[in-house]
Amino acid sequence: MKNNLPPFIEIYRALIATPSISATEEALDQSNESLINLLAGWFRDLGFNVEVQPVPDTRHKFNLLASTGHGAGGLLLAGHTDTVPFDDGRWTRDPFTLTEHDNKLYGLGTADMKGFFAFILDALRDVDVTTLKKPLYILATADEETSMAGARYFAETTQLRPDCAIIGEPTSLQPIRAHKGHMSNAIRIQGQSGHSSDPARGVNAIELMHDAIGRIMQLRDLLKERYHFEAFTVPYPTLNLGAIHGGDASNRICACCELHMDIRPLPGMTLNDLNGLLGEALAPVSERWPGRLTVSELHPPIPGYECPPDHKLVQVVEKLLGAQTDVVNYCTEAPFIQTLCPTLVLGPGSINQAHQPDEYLETRFIKPTRELISQVVHHFCWH
């Protein structure tokens, strides 16, 4: 089928050359509009209908949905367009110039995960999409590396219900059917300052936090005892105390203390239940010291995710790859896409290269990834 798509490596090169960093720090954050426009042109050239969706409450970020075919069901291939920032002093190559060396493609986003769209486009370049018996959707999202705002908004607003979805995160082509979630909170104690020579005239926030931490440790033990998912290498929800700040002088009663913590829930645990358990753990401190303890989110929470192991998608992909599905501890957009349809996480490149200086994708993934995309499209959109 005739089209004007550039060669695979030139598509890859153009994607890497188009910066699309997402960061909580405004000075580093970038719009992904230029990258979305690139993808829109290429998918239109293949005969897809393209919708560009502004994502609310972001700094000029967009989702893209390319669709072709008719009827219900079908297949969704998804990925995010953004990358993390880069540490200029630790890269030995230009992060925005695709460099091939020693059977590796170097550049920011080669593995995580702008390159996945180059594989999709290349796998479809010779396909007459008008002959599909079921729909094929390509979703490109924004801000996965920070808030996952793009996937959240798409899942909340779309009417699409594909038969199944694949998110092309770097899994070394090992299919992933489940991962833990992530919830991070700030616990803040507001005390009353005063001179350390007269403790009764103040309320020491560090002492109150000591009480709160003891109860949080009891919650950690409870989570470990009560909840299990044996497929994970760490088969229980983890709770970590990551940072604490409080006080300003040894001779002053501490007026404020703040603890940052996270919990990584198992699939099947709801965020509401988890918040309830945290609230119950801290209730004695709140009751004894009314108005002095607050809990706030550091980042929007991400639930755990699991694709049913007996679903057709799992069976088909395991047969195509000759590999069993696995589970991982890191988070993806899968919990949000899973609300629409059964979802697997599966893509080229290693997660060990994600967020690293001199990020790369090994060229050994090129041929099997093209073949896999062609096979899953054929199976779910032509059968």
Swiss-Prot record:
The protein's superkingdom reads: Bacteria
Q: Name one GO molecular function term.
A: zinc ion binding
Report the main location listed first in the record: cytoplasm
Cofactor, how bound (note): Binds 2 Zn(2+) or Co(2+) ions per subunit.
Record's keyword terms, sorted: Amino-acid biosynthesis, Arginine biosynthesis, Cobalt, Cytoplasm, Hydrolase, Metal-binding, Zinc
Q: Which reactions fall under this protein's catalytic activity?
A: N(2)-acetyl-L-ornithine + H2O = L-ornithine + acetate
The entry's cellular-component GO terms read: cytoplasm
Indicate whether RNA-binding appears among the record's keywords.
no
Q: Which CDD domains match?
A: M20_ArgE
Q: Name one Pfam family in it.
A: Peptidase_M20
Chain positions recorded as Zn(2+) 1 binding sites: 80, 112, 169
UniProt-annotated catalytic positions: 82, 144
Q: In which pathway does it act?
A: Amino-acid biosynthesis; L-arginine biosynthesis; L-ornithine from N(2)-acetyl-L-ornithine (linear): step 1/1
* Name of protein: Acetylornithine deacetylase
